Regions:
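Glycine-rich, anion-gripping cofactor-binding loops and their flanking helix/strand elements
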Residues: 4-89
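Phosphate- and divalent-cation-binding pockets in alpha/beta enzyme and binding domains
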Residues: 11-12, 74-75, 118, 162, ...
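Short loop/helix-cap segments at secondary-structure boundaries that form the rim of catalytic
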Residues: 32-42, 95-103, 184-185
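Phosphate/pyrophosphate-binding active-site segments
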Residues: 80-181
Length: 185
């Protein structure tokens, strides 16, 4: 699993993440602050909220790779802290320690694009590990397929949804605080 936190706009890694997700069956979760759009981006907060403890244990990754800075989602923080990971690698050009999920095992000193390019160039394995990756990604996709968008009129959530759906392509929108970011996810 790759979790993408806060990044500047024009960070040039969206296409790499899409390719890695497809080629290696990697689940990519990107925060709105990441300025990343991945085709199969999952609504992970909703998946986490709607999952039982047993399901959350199954959804927890063995390997977590994090790039970027902060994530707004308290749900992803809770999920990864509570259900843990075997390995957590944070990619940092400066080597700074960011242990948001309190599971950090390694810091890889590299810029995001170089690291992701290296991963993308690896040949997908045709063994048990690849089958396991496919099954893991399929778990997330099945949970996503079960989600339906509620239409709760006269609520903050509904108002933000209507606003976002009416915005033109390639518009920049500034959110003033984490609650508005949360509602937009």
């Amino acid at each position: 699993m790759i979790v993408v936190g806060q990044l500047p706009p024009e960070n040039n890694i969206s296409e790499l993440l899409k390719s890695i997700s497809r080629k290696h069956n990697v689940v990519v979760l990107s925060d709105h602050l990441s300025n990343i759009i991945v085709d199969d981006n999952l609504h992970y907060d909703t998946i986490i909220i709607s999952s039982s403890e047993t399901e959350l244990k199954e959804l927890a990754p063995d390997l977590l790779i994090t790039i970027g800075g902060h994530t707004v989602s308290k749900k992803i923080k809770y999920f990864l802290r509570t259900f843990g990971v075997s390995e957590h690698w944070h990619i940092s050009n400066s080597g700074d320690v960011v242990d948001t999920y309190q599971q950090l095992t390694d810091i890889i000193k590299s810029d995001n694009e170089t690291f992701l390019s290296y991963i993308n160039e690896l040949s997908p394995s045709q063994d048990e590990a690849q089958n396991e990756a496919e099954s893991y990604k399929e778990l997330w996709n099945k949970k996503r397929a079960l989600l339906t968008a509620p239409e709760i009129k006269y609520s903050d959530l509904y108002a933000v949804g209507m606003l976002l759906s009416s915005l033109p392509e390639n518009v920049s929108l500034h959110f003033a605080n984490s609650h508005s970011v949360y509602l937009s996810q």
